[in-house]
Amino acid sequence: MALDLLVVSAGSLALKVLRVTPLITTTILLVNRLAQYFALSTFLPPHTSPKKIDHVGAAFQHWLQTVVPRVWTGVISIVLFTRVALILNLFVRPDDLAGSNARFLYGVGLFLSFAHLSVAPKMLKFEKRMMSPETVPHVAMELLAGWMKVNNIRFWIVDVPFWVVGVWATLEGLKA
């Protein structure tokens, strides 16, 4: 069933915006992940001397307790917005996408938008322990190192492919 509404008629600006939205949102998420890596790796060696780990660890915990609640809502909102855009791209004017891989790619993108959930519980355990007032600073830094390993794997296995699929789906969707 196609949602052939006048506002999304073939060639309309609304349809073009819909087709481009996965590219925009996956790029935002990828840049967020890169910024996250550079921000968090600053607290770890070689950028931080092991001699300063207790001082830096305490500052890191305070920073994390402040930044996570501020950033979390925005990231979740963008992920949800991306999913809605991908679902709409699957069902709005699907006949326009015949002869291209766009619909398939929007579906792959939707799958990848959920793929990070496989590591989310482990990452949330790290985050809770890092932010806990009972966690001593040097342990928080050890937890951060472990979290970074899991996050780096997620970045290369999920986030980069998610972005590539977003780019590819957009290109396919616009040329269809």
Curated annotation (Swiss-Prot):
Coiled coil: none annotated. Induction: Expression is positively regulated by the oxaleimides biosynthesis cluster-specific transcription factor poxB. GO terms for cellular component: membrane. Pathway: Secondary metabolite biosynthesis. It is found in: Membrane. The keyword Repeat does not apply. Keywords: Membrane, Transmembrane, Transmembrane helix. It is a multi-pass membrane protein. The chain crosses the membrane at residues 5-25, 71-91, 104-124, 155-175. Part of the gene cluster that mediates the biosynthesis of oxaleimides, cytotoxic compounds containing an unusual disubstituted succinimide moiety. The first step of the pathway is provided by the HR-PKS poxF that serves in a new mode of collaborative biosynthesis with the PKS-NRPS poxE, by providing the olefin containing amino acid substrate via the synthesis of an ACP-bound dec-4-enoate. This is Oxaleimides biosynthesis cluster protein N. It comes from Penicillium oxalicum (strain 114-2 / CGMCC 5302) (Penicillium decumbens). The gene is poxN.
